[in-house]
A protein has these predicted regions:
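Short acidic/histidine-rich active-site segments
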Residues: 170-171, 202-225
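Structural preference for beta-strand elements that scaffold enzyme active sites
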Residues: 15, 33-37, 60-61, 110-114, ...
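Histidine/acidic residue-rich metal-binding segments in metalloenzymes
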Residues: 46-56, 78-135, 149-163, 190-206
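Active-site beta-loop-alpha junctions enriched in small/polar residues
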Residues: 19, 39-41, 67-69, 111, ...
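A metal-dependent hydrolase metal-coordination microenvironment
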Residues: 1-48, 64-69, 73-87, 92-107
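Mid-to-C-terminal alpha-helical segments outside catalytic/metal-binding sites
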Residues: 225-263
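Conserved, mostly hydrophobic/aromatic
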Residues: 19, 58, 113, 138, ...
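A conserved active-site cap/scaffold subdomain adjacent to cofactor or substrate pockets
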Residues: 166-175, 180
Length: 263
């Protein structure tokens, strides 16, 4: 597996984690922790045993969909080839029967359900049937950027927070910017901070982390082109009046708390 090959080549700096104890051990040894996750439920081939095989390979977090309908459920935005346009699934299109089976199997194995990319209806199904906290790894607030249907509504943010979950701030400009238009420059740090403050206002300080999606977005933030620029965001957050304790929560403490309780 390419993931494990890369880990092996860089083993002096990074190590795969399977449990929270592995994260603690990596911290002691000065190593970065890498948690293997899956994005796109079709890869499970509708079979719980496939999910078990992925778990054995170290998968500890997984989505139900990517950008297309599959046997588990619906994405929040998908392309309708008959009408040649993008559609939002909304609240009526939830998890399918196989999706509910996979949710149950995920929780039985210890794989954390990830609701990013999932339809509104799918989110509410996970919220209803999940027995443990879940997360949205790279989703923002729809209250600011409604053009991105994959963002979470205020109601979703509150539910996620009440259940002990976290959401990772996506740096993609269309997920960040109000009234975004195609071909605009990347998001500004001030726009990322506006999202962070909004999410904290809706769901509290414990529910927000970073889910940059650097490897999946076309336009990185204008002032932060890759992960090396993250200290710039931390500095900007303090300049914008956020407490250092809040910066710590957003950057690592909230996600660490979530993983300690659920990994």
């Amino acid at each position: 597996m390419l993931f494990q090959e890369e880990i092996k080549k860089n083993s002096q700096d990074i190590a795969q984690v399977f449990t929270y104890k592995d994260i603690e051990e990596n911290e002691k040894n000065g190593k970065i922790s890498a948690l293997l996750s899956l994005e796109e439920g079709a890869i499970y081939q509708r079979e719980p045993q496939m999910l078990r095989k992925f778990y054995e390979q170290g998968v500890r977090m997984a989505t139900f969909t990517w950008n297309y309908e599959n046997d588990l459920g619906y994405p929040n935005r998908f392309y309708n080839p008959l009408e040649q346009k993008m559609w939002s699934a909304g609240e009526t299109a939830g998890l399918k029967e196989k999706g509910l089976e996979m949710l149950e199997e995920m929780e039985a194995l210890g794989i954390i359900p990830d609701v990013s990319h999932l339809s509104d209806g799918g989110f509410y199904d996970v919220a209803k049937y999940a027995k443990r906290p879940f997360l949205a790894s790279h989703s923002n607030a729809r209250g600011i950027a409604p053009n991105a249907a994959r963002n979470l509504t205020d109601d979703m943010i509150r539910i996620l927070a009440e259940k002990g979950g976290v959401m990772g701030l996506n740096f993609c400009v269309s997920f960040v910017r109000e009234n975004w238009k195609p071909k605009e420059d990347g998001a500004l740090l001030s726009e990322l901070i506006r999202q962070i403050k909004y999410i904290i206002c809706v769901g509290g300080e414990e529910c927000i982390g970073l889910g940059s999606d650097f490897d999946g977005i076309e336009e990185a933030p204008s002032e932060m082109k890759n992960a090396a620029g993250l200290p710039l965001l931390a500095e900007a957050m303090e300049r914008e009046g956020m407490l250092y304790s809040q910066v710590e929560k957003v950057f690592f403490k909230n996600v660490k708390r979530f993983l300690k309780e659920n990994l």
